[in-house]
Amino acid sequence: MESAPSGGLLALIIISIILLACISAVVSAYETAITSITSYKWSNYVKTHNKQKKLTTKIVNHFQKNYSACLITILVANNIVAILVSNILFLALDQSIKNPAISSALNLLISGVLLLMLCEITPKTLARINIIRVLVYFAVVVYFFYILFWPITKLASIIFAKYEKAPPVSRRDVYFFIDEIEQNGLFTKEDGQLIKRTLIFDQVLVDQIMIKWNRVVYCYEGDPVKTIKEKFLHGQFSRMPVLDQTSNEVVGFIHLKDLFSSLEKSNEPFVLQELLYPAVLVSNTTPIKQALRQMRLHRAHLAVVQDKHHHTIGIVSMEDIIEELVGEIYDEHDEVEAVQTLDNNTWLVLPNVKAAFFFNKWIKRDLVKSKNMTIQRYLASFENDGLNTQNKLETPWFIAEAIVDSENPEQIRYEIRKKSDVVD
């Protein structure tokens, strides 16, 4: 009958198992860290902490460039450790326990619990919480095994070289990233929408935002001053296209300010042609980003839109283009609408709008039962005694905030934002 291991041998076995378990834990944690880290997060850490010249930084950068070889190093190390631990335990238990079945069962149980709990689950969980620290603290240890297994890692680098390049980031990836940042509260929904609009800014064509020609107010070169004045005053805009009476082509734009400045000079004859700004021509298939650049180059606020046959089909203003980024723009002379749409989930509403009309149409069907209750009364019916200018009202369906006119404190409107998880 074989005797149990001596005290010295038992100590050596325990030390060997602990050492191997530590190695397995380190490489397992590093596997999670190198898989979880993003290039921008690592670059930000290096620049913020001025770690560009550190050895650990160079090692991590090398691992990111040779990702497959790094993972193979970790997998080889883990498998070797698992084999060694299992065999050491088997030899120790085989000498101590007579029954081979019990010995094998204990070997399986101890090595399984040890490797799974202490060398896999625990280190990987901790690595998810401390990604940067794991990458920095254990970089040299993992690099040692990387060099130790160099023939295998080199072969892996050659085989997987064409797969090392990360796939390009798509707009959809960026949208998901923005949504995730919004959910974490790093910036507001409006900020996210502005960034998303910026991403698709170069894809929007002039044809999608232009004012069609049948809606454009214009005048002719030969029109009397009175007619031009009436069109300006009736339309309440600052610029107007001027057409040639013979060809019906746009010859330029006249500015309201120039018109009335000229009329004030009663001692000089009124000559419309002297007040014209040259017309900037853009195609209806031109991206608005390019159209904006062209208008800025010519210092023009309006541009004439033409189709592929060079026929005038509309106009586009710089304001129309900017609204694609920031949403609808209202000035002091715009008529205040009862419900103004700021974005897909946000509205600016007057207090006297019927609550049933607004909430049942835009927030949630059948949310308000009373057909005669106004927005103001409906918001005041909640438990916090209504809405004032110092706080917001938050419900399961929407968030409402009172917006007070700084020049007229009695004039209040409500900014109402629908929550993203509300289903109509």
Swiss-Prot record:
Keywords, alphabetical: CBS domain, Cell membrane, Membrane, Repeat, Transmembrane, Transmembrane helix
Residue intervals of the CNNM transmembrane domain: 6-191
GO CC entries: plasma membrane
PROSITE patterns: CBS, CNNM
Highest taxon, organism lineage: Bacteria
Matching InterPro entries: CBS_dom, CBS_dom_sf, CNNM, Ion_transp-like_CBS
Residues annotated as domain CBS: 210-270, 275-335
Transmembrane segments: 7-27, 71-91, 101-121, 135-155
Cell compartment(s), UniProt: Cell membrane
Protein topology in the membrane: Multi-pass membrane protein
Coiled coil: none
Family note: Belongs to the UPF0053 family.
Annotated protein name in UniProt: UPF0053 protein MG146 homolog
Species the sequence originates in: Mycoplasma pneumoniae (strain ATCC 29342 / M129 / Subtype 1)
